[in-house]
């Protein structure tokens, strides 16, 4: 929120009890700060830390009343962006996302937001914005690529089908983390911690990533 023209809020995947109540009372998933429905935002960014969280992605989209598949979304829906460690292998969940940050998103935030502001008032299509986003280094737009697979499910080929999509999407790295933002007071769930363990972050990122 360092930009005066952008307001970023938080949202989390509800636990089973709240999920049940929200569905029964038809309450759409909403932001923590404003309580505005997620479906009314311009973007929905989802951090994907582990493969076991993939079902949470569908839960968030479903509770938000956002079409699950990117191809079914319209100008009335937010752009869904994936980020985090699992985006290094995005294909298993590619059809649910409009965009992926490959690597660290801080390097592309400003350019993407500026492109969105320019597009928003232009009257252009959703696809045209994605074409502009595909030109930003580090952004992967699944719509603009054709993936073919071997019989064992491994990736056989990966080919752009749009003139604006690069043949290779280069991961982005923040080389100097001295001034990189870090959440000092993260929201934590009021539930029993998995395996009764403590997670202590001693560095940014993964030494094998």
What residues fall within each predicted segment?
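Conserved mixed alpha/beta core segments that line enzyme active sites in large multi-domain catalysts
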Residues: 53, 60-62, 69-73, 180-197, ...
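Local cysteine-cluster metal-coordination motifs and their immediate loop/turn environment
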Residues: 201-209
């Amino acid at each position: 929120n360092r930009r005066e023209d952008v307001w970023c809020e938080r949202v989390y995947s509800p636990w089973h009890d709240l999920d049940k109540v929200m569905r029964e009372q038809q309450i759409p998933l909403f932001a923590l700060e404003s309580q505005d429905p997620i479906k009314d935002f311009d973007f929905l960014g989802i951090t994907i830390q582990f493969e076991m969280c993939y079902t949470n992605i569908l839960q968030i989209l479903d509770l938000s009343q956002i079409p699950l598949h990117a191809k079914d979304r319209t100008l009335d829906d937010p752009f869904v962006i994936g980020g985090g460690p699992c985006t290094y292998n995005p294909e298993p969940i590619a059809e649910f996302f409009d965009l992926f940050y490959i690597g660290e998103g801080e390097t592309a935030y400003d350019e993407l937001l500026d492109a969105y502001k320019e597009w928003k008032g232009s009257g252009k299509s959703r696809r045209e914005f994605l074409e502009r986003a595909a030109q930003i280094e580090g952004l992967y737009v699944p719509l603009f690529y054709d993936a073919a697979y071997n019989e064992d499910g491994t990736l056989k080929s990966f080919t752009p089908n749009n003139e604006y999509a690069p043949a290779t999407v280069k991961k982005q790295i923040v080389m100097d983390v001295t001034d990189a933002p870090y959440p000092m007071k993260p929201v934590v769930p009021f539930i029993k911690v998995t395996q009764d363990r403590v997670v202590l972050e001693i560095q940014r990122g993964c030494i094998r990533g």
